[in-house]
């Protein structure tokens, strides 16, 4: 699914940080360090990044039901 624009718990805007987080983690950086560098301090917001799973492409493989 798409990454949320805001944290589900506190409502802080976090969506603008997703691409930078994803790029740096894929490059091999520690996710916790990346979140610290991006200024994500609340554990509820950090959870949003660490628990997000991209499944959009898997869902697209299912046929439409009429």
Curated annotation (Swiss-Prot):
How is this protein annotated for GO cellular component?
cytoplasm; DNA-directed RNA polymerase complex
Cofactor dependency: Zn(2+)
Name the PROSITE patterns on file.
RNA_POL_N_8KD
Q: Which gene encodes it?
A: rpo10
Species, as recorded: Staphylothermus marinus (strain ATCC 43588 / DSM 3639 / JCM 9404 / F1)
Name of this chain's protein: DNA-directed RNA polymerase subunit Rpo10
Family from the record: Belongs to the archaeal Rpo10/eukaryotic RPB10 RNA polymerase subunit family.
- Keywords annotated in UniProt: Cytoplasm, DNA-directed RNA polymerase, Metal-binding, Nucleotidyltransferase, Transcription, Transferase, Zinc
Catalysed reactions, as listed in the record: RNA(n) + a ribonucleoside 5'-triphosphate = RNA(n+1) + diphosphate
Main location as per UniProt: cytoplasm
Q: What class of enzyme is it?
A: transferase
